[in-house]
Amino acid sequence: MSIEILIIDDNADIRNIINDLIIDAGFKTRLAANYNQALNEIDKKLPDVAIIDV
């Protein structure tokens, strides 16, 4: 079973850097740029972990 991480950050560059690092570490990721996208991703499937830029 692979851990799935939801990355939520409005800055695309930062979001993609974090995404690349996490994928390289062997985890699955999903991305969201804002609150609405994050809720849509959570509604699809609850992630194991969320990294949130506040």
Language-model-detected regions and their locations in the chain:
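Non-catalytic signal-transmission and effector/linker regions of two-component phosphorelay proteins
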Residues: M1-L6, A25
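Acidic, metal-coordinating helix/loop segments flanking the phosphotransfer/catalytic sites
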Residues: L31-V49
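Residues in flexible loops and secondary-structure boundaries
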Residues: N16, A25, L39-N40, A50
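Two-component/phosphorelay signaling modules centered on CheY-like receiver
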Residues: A12-R30
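Active-site residues of response regulator receiver
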Residues: D53
